[in-house]
């Protein structure tokens, strides 16, 4: 299972929308809920979390420099095409490594 974290300013409404977008993207590629889990966090909380992948904007990515995870930045967190292009290769690489 690949753990992802959608990071936004407050970790509330916009984070939930981003989480749902990530879930739709991964489901569109045929992945099920046993392949991934998406959490939501504000930037302060995110630094103490341990997902495999953070998805956020470049503004918040600067605060995640020292984490031990992939940090994927997107310009528009609500654009599912952009999310898809940004995360799918890294997601599949991590998932395949975990299945070995």
Predicted segment positions?
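Short polar/charged helix/loop
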Residues: 2-100
